[in-house]
UniProtKB/Swiss-Prot annotation:
It is a single-pass type I membrane protein. One of its GO terms (cellular component) is plasma membrane. Belongs to the CD300 family. The lineage of its organism: Eukaryota, Metazoa, Chordata, Craniata, Vertebrata. It comes from Mus musculus. InterPro entries: CD300_family_receptors (IPR050671), Ig-like_dom_sf (IPR036179), Ig-like_fold (IPR013783), Ig_sub (IPR003599), Ig_V-set (IPR013106). Residues 38-48 are annotated as: May play an important role in murine norovirus (MNV) binding. Its main location: membrane. Keywords: Cell membrane, Disulfide bond, Host cell receptor for virus entry, Immunity, Immunoglobulin domain, Membrane, Receptor, Signal, Transmembrane, Transmembrane helix. This is CMRF35-like molecule 5. GO terms for biological process: immune system process; regulation of interleukin-6 production; regulation of tumor necrosis factor production.
């Protein structure tokens, strides 16, 4: 009878140990400013359950960093992402932009009623070489500060724009001067010419009349 009870407890879901429910690497390492990946395996029974990645001890009160939504969709939060492969019964955790402070105890876990199946993973972070850190800093500074070449190109472009605008200004002034000549000075000249013609015309008529009068009244020889 006790053997039947033991077998029943073994096959009941949730009664197996954490190592039997979810497994993974006991230790992983990554380099500062790099990334690392952890693959946690689980039995087919937990296919439709939420999986998570948490940090800290004790394990029952660890801080959950990221958790799936019972699907195979990628879930990302800050620098940590998780994806569940329900065909191969593996969920993959990726940590990016690693920092020295990321080193510590983590857990692969499955959310269920009662104690969650969990597996302990020790994460180690190796310090990045100084040359790599200097290269990263130089790249950031280069992206922030404008290069002298670009600045020179901008100045040459502005100078060309100013030079090209001067002929347009001269052409506009010439057009305005021509219009003033046509609409102001030309009518003035025509008016002066008309006045001169009007003044000189009566004088000619008056002179011609006097000559005729002299001829008419001159004595006959």
């Amino acid at each position: 009878m006790w053997q039947f009870s033991a077998l029943l407890l073994f096959f009941l879901p949730g009664c197996c140990t954490a190592q039997d429910s979810v497994t993974g690497p006991e230790e992983v390492s990554g380099q500062e400013q790099g990334s690392l990946t952890v693959q946690c395996r689980y039995s087919s029974y937990w296919k439709g359950y939420k999986k998570y990645w948490c940090r800290g001890v004790p394990q029952r009160s660890c801080d959950i960093l990221v958790e799936t939504d019972k699907s195979e969709q990628l879930v990302k939060k800050n620098r940590v992402s998780i994806r569940d492969n329900q065909r191969d019964f593996i969920f993959t955790v990726t940590m990016e932009d690693l920092r020295m402070s990321d080193a510590g105890i983590y857990w692969c876990g499955i959310t269920k009623g009662g104690p969650d199946p969990m597996f302990k993973v020790n994460v180690n972070i190796d310090q990045a070489p100084k040359s790599s850190m200097m290269t990263t800093t130089a790249t950031v500074l280069k992206s922030i500060q404008p290069s002298a070449e670009n600045t020179g190109k901008e100045q040459v472009t502005q100078s060309k724009e100013v030079t090209q605008s001067r002929p347009h200004t001269r052409s506009l002034l010439s057009s305005i001067y021509f219009l003033l000549m046509v609409f102001v000075e030309l009518p003035l000249l025509l008016s002066m010419l008309s006045a001169v013609l009007w003044v000189t015309r009566p004088q000619r008529c008056f002179g011609r009349g006097e000559n005729d009068l002299v001829k008419t009244h001159s004595p006959v020889a």
